[in-house]
Each structure stands twice: as C-alpha cells, then as structure tokens.
Design a protein with these regions (language model features):
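The substrate-binding groove and active-site-proximal loops of carbohydrate-active enzymes
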Residues: 1, 40-43, 148-155
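Active-site beta-loop-alpha junctions enriched in small/polar residues
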Residues: 1, 20-22, 69-71, 96-100, ...
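Generic preference for well-ordered secondary structure
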Residues: 30, 64-67, 95-98, 137, ...
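Histidine-acidic metal/acid-base catalytic patches
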Residues: 51, 55, 77-91, 101-166
C-alpha cells in the first residue's frame, strides 16, 4: 500500500508488476535454462491472484502493467500471450523490447495482438553478438547483463520502426 500511495502521489500512469518468486535473474550460478516454470495447478492460482491484485489496483485508480522478464515465470512471447489471454481486461501489458528479444520473442507481434491491453513499454536494445554468445553458452542472466547484452535504443539490433508504428 505504501508503494501504491507513492506512485499515486507521483502521478504515475501505472504500476509495473512482475512475478519474481524463484527468479534466477540475479543468481550468478543458475543459467536461464533453469528458470522457474509454473505447472497447471500453480498457473491457475497465479492467474487468480494477478486478477485479484489488478482489480484492487483499479479500485485504487492505478492500473497494473505486467512486465515479462528474463529469468522469471513469464519470460517468453507464448507465456506473455497466455498471461494476457488468461487474465481479466484490468491486467495491462508492459512490453520490454530487450527482454522479449532476449527470450527469442517478437515485440511487434505482441503489440499488434494485445494493443488494447498495452499500457507501458520499456525500450531496451540488444547487442546481438552478446545475446548470441549468452544463448549459445547458456549463461546466467546476470552474466549476460554484466557482459553488456542490453543497451540503449539505436545501439543494438532491434528495429524500432515497426514496433513504434503499432
């Protein structure tokens, strides 16, 4: 509640949310291939809880923007699409271009398919040579980050024109 009030006081347009339980994003020893995944029973509980949190946030005048993220239970394009398809319309989408490309997904496709739910973006670029090395060697997310996989838009391999047109 304290964080929510701070965001409201700052006139934030939304609150970004990502499920990071058991995330491997900061672990220097666990490769991304060992990230957590949800079984069907846990998925149903997860969706129920996301919907409940989102409804509470809407009641407070602050939409929830779900952030897919490397090393978490919602990482890939398919997982992100499934999350949006499974949740109420109150759950909005944040697309992070860098994380989506890192997960071998398509930000343009997500934006087109879920434009009515898209509320926020993080424009990160990716250095392809570092991404390729990280994927080939099953690096940890932390190592890929420290190696410089992410960069500012225009300094990497993402073509932002199609994404921004959506």
């Amino acid at each position: 509640r304290k964080q929510l009030n701070l965001f409201k006081d700052c006139k934030a347009p939304c609150m970004v949310f990502a499920e990071v339980t058991d995330s491997v994003q900061g672990d220097p020893k666990v490769p991304l291939s060992k990230r957590p995944k949800l079984n069907e029973d846990v998925w149903k509980k997860f969706i129920f809880r996301i919907n409940e949190i989102s409804k509470m946030m809407i009641d407070e005048g602050m939409p929830l923007a779900y952030h897919h993220h490397m090393g978490t239970v919602i990482e890939t394009e398919n997982e992100t699409a499934r999350l949006i398809e499974s949740t109420d319309d109150s759950v909005k989408l944040l697309i992070d271009t860098g994380h989506m490309l890192f997960a071998q997904g398509n930000s343009v496709k997500l934006a087109k398919n879920f434009s009515q739910r898209l509320i926020h973006v993080h424009c990160k670029d990716i250095r392809k040579n570092i991404l390729d090395h990280s994927l080939k060697n099953d690096s940890t997310f932390r190592q890929a980050f420290l190696d410089g996989a992410f960069t500012v838009p225009g300094d990497g391999c993402i073509d932002y024109k199609p994404f921004l047109k959506v």
